[in-house]
């Protein structure tokens, strides 16, 4: 285990005023600095939460990169970017690293507006190679000579976009370095043929030695030695795939180097220099790292320490989440799906490298033949599900709202046009908190409700989520169920659920105004209405639309013709979202007759990082925010 922060005898980091200062350090100083970085990262993440295991695994690689390249000139692009904590500490942000992932603090990902050394923003996987190739082409067009380096993990390399980038880079032959950070993990354990390919015969030094010894021995044979050795070399090219993972990348016309010990700074620097010296084709340097390196709990269970909240350093146990808290929406989803699968063997579950995050690990354990983790391949996941649905199965695609964006064409082309009964379970819909703009589930209502043939359902609590899963089983067409990150509201879960009706529900009667809300905003709206009745004697009605597409039209039209003050609330982008759909319905049915209509939702700009509570307060997506808006609406003109 790494030393606690207060036991670091000598601070090297405090003397790093410029990233290039690392090039002046001795090897021993770099090793000391690596320990210092580990201690700071562990301490900070234990307080703030964050992506611990990925960042601990690349500290030596980060130091070697900065010892070899000049980030003021060379372009270094980190794929996904959740492993860049050491990078941030070494590129001028050590003084405010304690603000990591906090409101108005440092982002947990590369961000071009945060530092000149963050050359390309990230958050989603597999973008680095394509972006780096674009930068390499721009460099060549301008006649410049700097290096462009993409650092990508083996998890990201399961994504099709990474191979599209490799394919184009090889065809173009641009001078480009790709560093493959191979820790045999993405978030969940890596899957697919590529993972098996990379993990085969990693320690290949003996292979090289044996090959050279055999070749030397063959050459020593009198008369025919050279001829036999040449034949053996040709045969070796055919057999190379047995021993060499690099053959895959060489097929893409990359010069393959490695694998290299990713925690041996000296060795990494040597091989990075070798890669930098090759100027006639792209290069891939294969680096082997250990996720969670230096913190024993993270080394033993890297998936649990991939991304986590605040925790106790000594035990590794999370600090929050009281045992008395309601179950999370994710947990309710996973448990309910397993209950249904016990009764209906048509149910299959698909996730994209997020089994633990989407709550499907339990399903995987109980029904392994009906579970598929496709890796970071959202496009494939959706069309794979469509194929299953076409053969009579009931596929549930468990995916974060933000990652569903990556499969938009497949949702339309392969599922909705054919009206196949695929259920999209959109976890983390709405504001997710500290991961920021790349991870908020802000757009799913907007990009889904314009598609024909798909229904969209947003349960208001964990009991309704349970019912929504039951509803999906009775559906014979596409369905999306969206639900937020975090704990439920604390309602009792029934032992047996029934499908939800195709209508909304009036939860509270009133006459001064009505709140029409959806999903996660229904219960805050109800609380706000109750409080205003007690505090201000205001009579506020509350309607849970429940369905976004199709809307409960007759109910909404009746409400529009009844109330003069209407507040529409959603945890989604206002542009094209639920409230837009309701106002369109009112306009199309001549229901607009001078009412005051206000909307609360996510405005038309990208929401930065901060806690869910803080961000929702800023956006009025809270009980107090709703009360404030209602009081403004009800003021006399």
Curated annotation (Swiss-Prot):
Cofactor detail note: Binds 1 Mg(2+) ion per subunit.
GO cellular component: cytosol
Matching PROSITE patterns: TRANSKETOLASE_1, TRANSKETOLASE_2
Catalytic activity: D-glyceraldehyde 3-phosphate + pyruvate + H(+) = 1-deoxy-D-xylulose 5-phosphate + CO2
Superkingdom, natural source: Bacteria
Pathway(s) of this molecule: Metabolic intermediate biosynthesis; 1-deoxy-D-xylulose 5-phosphate biosynthesis; 1-deoxy-D-xylulose 5-phosphate from D-glyceraldehyde 3-phosphate and pyruvate: step 1/1
This enzyme's EC code(s): 2.2.1.7
Binding site for Mg(2+): 154, 183
Record-linked Gene3D superfamilies: 3.40.50.920, 3.40.50.970
Keywords: Isoprene biosynthesis, Magnesium, Metal-binding, Thiamine biosynthesis, Thiamine pyrophosphate, Transferase
Keyword Oxidoreductase: no
Gene Ontology BP terms: 1-deoxy-D-xylulose 5-phosphate biosynthetic process; isopentenyl diphosphate biosynthetic process, methylerythritol 4-phosphate pathway; terpenoid biosynthetic process; thiamine biosynthetic process
Function: Catalyzes the acyloin condensation reaction between C atoms 2 and 3 of pyruvate and glyceraldehyde 3-phosphate to yield 1-deoxy-D-xylulose-5-phosphate (DXP).
Subunit structure: Homodimer.
Protein name, per record: 1-deoxy-D-xylulose-5-phosphate synthase
The organism of origin for this protein: Lawsonia intracellularis (strain PHE/MN1-00)
Gene name linked to the record: dxs
């Amino acid at each position: 285990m790494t030393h606690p922060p207060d036991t670091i005898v000598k601070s090297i980091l405090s003397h790093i005023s410029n990233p290039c200062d690392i090039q002046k350090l001795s090897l021993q100083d770099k090793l000391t600095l690596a320990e210092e970085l580990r201690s700071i990262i562990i301490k900070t993440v234990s307080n703030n939460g964050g992506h611990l295991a990925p960042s601990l695994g690349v500290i030596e690689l980060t130091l070697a990169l900065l010892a070899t390249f000049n980030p003021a000139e060379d372009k270094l692009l980190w794929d996904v970017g959740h492993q860049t904590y050491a990078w941030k500490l070494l590129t001028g942000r050590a003084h405010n690293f304690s603000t990591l992932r906090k409101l108005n603090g440092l982002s947990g990902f590369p961000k071009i507006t945060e530092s000149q050394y963050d050359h390309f923003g990230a958050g989603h996987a597999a973008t680095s190679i394509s972006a780096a190739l674009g930068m390499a082409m721009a460099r060549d067009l301008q006649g410049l000579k700097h290096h462009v380096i993409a650092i990508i993990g083996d998890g990201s390399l399961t994504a099709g976009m990474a191979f599209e980038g490799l394919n184009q880079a090889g065809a173009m032959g641009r001078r480009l370095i790709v560093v493959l950070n191979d820790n045999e993990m993405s978030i969940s354990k890596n899957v697919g043929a590529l993972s098996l390919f990379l993990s085969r015969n990693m320690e290949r030094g003996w292979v090289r030695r044996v090959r050279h010894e055999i070749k030397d021995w063959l050459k020593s044979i009198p008369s025919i030695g050279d001829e036999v050795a040449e034949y053996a070399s040709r045969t070796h090219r055919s057999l190379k795939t047995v021993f060499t993972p690099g053959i895959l990348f060489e097929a893409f016309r990359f010069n393959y180097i490695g694998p290299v010990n990713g925690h041996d700074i000296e060795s990494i620097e040597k091989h990075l220099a070798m890669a930098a010296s090759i100027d006639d084709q792209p290069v891939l340097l294969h680096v082997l790292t250990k996720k969670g390196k230096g913190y024993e709990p993270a080394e033993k269970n890297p998936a649990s320490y991939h991304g986590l909240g605040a925790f106790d350093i000594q035990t590794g146990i999370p600090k929050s989440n009281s045992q008395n808290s309601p179950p999370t929406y994710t947990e309710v989803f996973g448990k309910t799906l397993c209950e249904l699968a016990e009764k209906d063997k048509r149910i299959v579950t698909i996730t994209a490298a997020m089994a633990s995050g989407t709550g499907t690990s339990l399903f995987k354990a109980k029904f392994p033949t009906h579970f598929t983790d496709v890796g970071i391949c959202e496009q494939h996941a959706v069309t794979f599900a469509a194929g299953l649905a076409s053969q009579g199965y009931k596929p549930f695609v468990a995916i974060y709202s933000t990652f569903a964006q990556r499969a938009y064409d497949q949702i339309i082309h392969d599922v909705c046009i054919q009206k196949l009964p695929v259920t999209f379970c959109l976890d983390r819909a709405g504001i997710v908190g500290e991961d920021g703009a790349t991870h908020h589930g802000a757009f799913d209502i907007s990009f889904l409700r314009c598609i024909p043939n798909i229904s969209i359902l947003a349960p208001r609590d964990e009991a309704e989520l349970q019912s929504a899963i039951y509803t999906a089983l009775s559906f014979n067409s596409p369905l999306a169920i969206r639900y937020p990150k975090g704990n439920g509201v604390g309602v009792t879960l029934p032992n047996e659920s029934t499908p939800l009706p195709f209508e909304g529900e009036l939860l509270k009667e009133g006459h001064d105004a009505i709140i029409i809300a959806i999903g996660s905003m229904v219960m805050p709206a109800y609380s706000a209405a109750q409080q205003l009745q007690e505090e201000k004697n205001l009579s506020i009605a509350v309607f849970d639309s429940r369905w976004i597409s199709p809307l409960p039209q007759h109910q909404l039209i009746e409400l529009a013709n009844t109330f003069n003050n209407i507040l529409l609330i959603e945890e989604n982008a206002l542009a094209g979202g639920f409230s837009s759909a309701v106002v369109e319905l009112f306009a199309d049915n001549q229901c607009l007759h001078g009412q005051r209509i206000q909307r609360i939702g996510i405005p038309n700009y990208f929401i930065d990082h901060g806690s869910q509570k803080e961000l929702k307060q800023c956006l009025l997506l809270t009980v107090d925010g709703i009360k404030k808006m209602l009081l403004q609406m009800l003021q006399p003109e």
